[in-house]
Amino acid sequence: MERPFHHARTLCIAGVSATALLWAAAPAFAQDAQPAAAEPEATTVDEIVVTGFRSSLQQALNVKKREAGAVDAIFAEDIADFPDQNLAEAIQRLPGVTIDRENGQGRTISVRGLGADFTRVRINGLEAQAAYGGNRSRGFDFSMFASELFNSIKVRKTQSAEIEEGSLGATVDLQTGRPLDFKGAGFNSALSVQGSYNDLSEKTVPRVAGLLSWSNENKTFGVLASVAYSERAPISESFNTTRWQAGDPSLAYGAGNNFAGCIPCTTTAQRSEVLSAFYPRIPRYTFGTFNEDRLGLTTALQWRPSDRTEVVLDLMWSRFNVEAESPNIEAISFSRAAGGVRDTIVRDYAIDKDKNVISYGVFDKVDIRSENGFTRDESNFYQASLNLRHEFTDRLRGTAKIGANKSEARTPQSFSYMFDANDQNGFTYDFRGNDRLPMINYGFDVTSGSRFTLTERRKSTGGANFENSVFAGTMEYDYTPEFTIKAGGEYRTYGFDTFGYQQAASVLTGADRVVGVDALGKIVSIDGKLDIPTGSDLSYIVPDIWKINEFLSVFDDALVPTYNGFREVEETDKGIFVQADFNTELLGMTVRGNAGIRRAVTETTSKGYLNTDYVTVNNEYADTLPSFNLAIEPRDDLVIRFGAAKVMSRPALGDLTPGGSLSTPTRRVSYGNPLLKPFRATNFDVAAEWYFQNEGLLAAAVFYKDIESFITTVTETVPWKSLGLDDSLLAGTPASPDENFDVTRKVNGSGGTLHGLEIQYQQPFSFLPGFWSNFGFIGNYTYVESEVDYGSGRKGPLTNQSKNAFNTTLYYEVDRFQARVSAAYRSGYLLAFPGGNGNSEEGVNDTVNFDASMSYNISDSLTLSLEALNLSDEFNDRYVDVTDRVSNYRHTGREVAIGLRWKY
């Protein structure tokens, strides 16, 4: 859902940022007239020398122009110096790309309206999965890696036969540095040190990166190593409701989700008004404290014994750890039926008829809960790959690739405790002054533990493993200088497994159930940066986790396995392809491109617990995937593109589990679906690109995707024997394999369509006089519409698809100084359709993020930098229903980093 974009604060931030850029650039212009010192390494294009940020822009345009398909790229500005601190934040600058943020940093991307599960990511040519926390999908988590470890990113939006299958949206290539990439022989090195300050947490944390590379005099052998370490300590402040729900006026008071009574409801109309209006399930202010540390290492050995042969060994390791504490206080009984809202009495109320919500209420007999949780997540990623390239003759050459990677996600510690104060009177909330930040008062002194009882403890641990291995080879033969035949294949294995354990009993009894919890609690406060209305309780007692851990001897407690936490998928992907590349002249125009076909066979073995039985189901499917890409150059500065391809994306890993529940007496089954086929689509792309000057581009692209199958959840009556489950599961029961069962599961639905437009404009202002000629602009806009069938007659847009998105950057660069201000806008998008608890949908409202950076070259080797992220302290605003009821309204503050960078 899009909210109005004409915010005074947004315009103010944009104006101040642009003014600051001009102000900062003025001294640099003054020094521009002085004799210039030796310039850093440069990229030369048509006798014009550009460096730094402008050099990286020109490199990206060179790649975009020469590719046969639709490709956008980002390059490092210098050794171990990427344009953004976060990979996802960098990729979002490209047309068609939007990102999802968590705790103030980008984590996953969507390309042309298709989310992370539809996008493949390769690191040094090897498909990779980076898992963190609760991520159990195919989506890649970019927060795992420091951007300094990489020197380029390419986003391939059209498919060719030589690129492995598996993406409906895009294939993203991340490339780390290699020693023979540097111009000079001998040593090359870089070291950067930063301190980053968050204005919400008021903490300063370090960020350090270094690179050392060596090559021999003949540039035939080299070794490179890089390291990056960083910390973050953000705070998340928010208000959330955990959705809204409504009662039913056709039922009696105290039935269903109805309140027990309504004192001011003296008429049937008033009663109906209250019982049919939505109310927040768990209204609460909350904040989380996070401590993150990230460490990454890369190593590359590169050998070129001759011009015809190259061997590269790439090694990579990354670690990402997060500790989070999340204290909050809430009216928990609004989310319960029996023993909760059915006992609550409405003492006073007001209705917002536009949203159909109880916008203000005073309630008696409300259960108040104070809780606190601690989680430690640990993630590790390992990869090794060996790439071989050899030219057998001037016309015949080949490549081979072998490699493996593993991603481990662990939650070794996760525990939480609850203080409950039941049947409290006078609980009040009021949204009338602000529909995102209500006044909340609990009706008693919530800083005192006298009314609270320690009632529950929850402890769990779990994790997931993703393993991937690849062997691939390709041969190329130049039939003529204008025509090349390519053929090759891959054999890939993919493994995924999860596990989970939890405490057997969570409700405390006996001496552990403490009444009066002052000795076991601590006072926390929300400091008012949320502009919370007057009258709200901003300080409250919460469980002190470490005191209670000691009191309950929690680390001595045994854990039991959770059956639904154990599942596995073993996948084997085999592919072969043949492709013809052409580059010729036709009617005075350069015509180039490729045409090919790929055959892919997928075999899966899925395992999981159905009740307490461990079930194994095998599946196999095959796809024939033709593709065609054409680039026509009517002039040297103009490229017209056309692309068409059949594509596929494999089902989400969680959807393949045969685990779930089985009730033979009622003939009901609820599980994933290990027999799922992939998402399949036919893509069409048309684009025009005008490279009107050095570093200049004006481009437009339209795209259309006919999604032939889309995975949805349905409940249907089908024969047991059609499910692929073993008949032995029915042994000893009255049910037989020939009977029908009511089955809730994932199925391949009928699909839908997606279409859109991208516009891209980039230009240095070299046509302006003097000082102004050092400025430049980069901007892109993306429009996407989609409609897919979610089953049961429900049609709507794809989740994670924003209708409108744009990115802009205004930059200034001279020999020793550069600065830029960037904005990234994303319109609202869906998270779930339909939503839960009777809400029509769940989604995120539009956002706009502003960033700025500047740097000054003190010398040829030493650079001072200043970066500011999220200048407007943008809120992440989640909603439910088309009426835009608040679900989670969160912010994490601004970050400012100052640093020094040295290179040799």
Predicted regions and their residues:
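C-terminal beta-signal and adjacent terminal beta-strands/loops
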Residues: 708-709, 825-834, 855-904
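Transmembrane beta-strands of outer-membrane beta-barrel pores
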Residues: 157, 176, 195-199, 229-233, ...
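Flexible glycine-rich, low-complexity coil/linker segments exposed to the extracellular/periplasmic environment
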Residues: 250-280, 342-366, 427-455, 508-565, ...
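Extracytoplasmic beta-strand/coil segments of soluble accessory domains associated
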Residues: 88-130, 157
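Outer-membrane beta-barrel translocator/receptor signature
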Residues: 132-139, 148-155, 162-265, 289-295, ...
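Gram-negative outer-membrane beta-barrel transporters
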Residues: 704-706, 723-833, 872
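Outer-membrane beta-barrel transmembrane strands
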Residues: 176, 193-195, 204-215, 281-326, ...
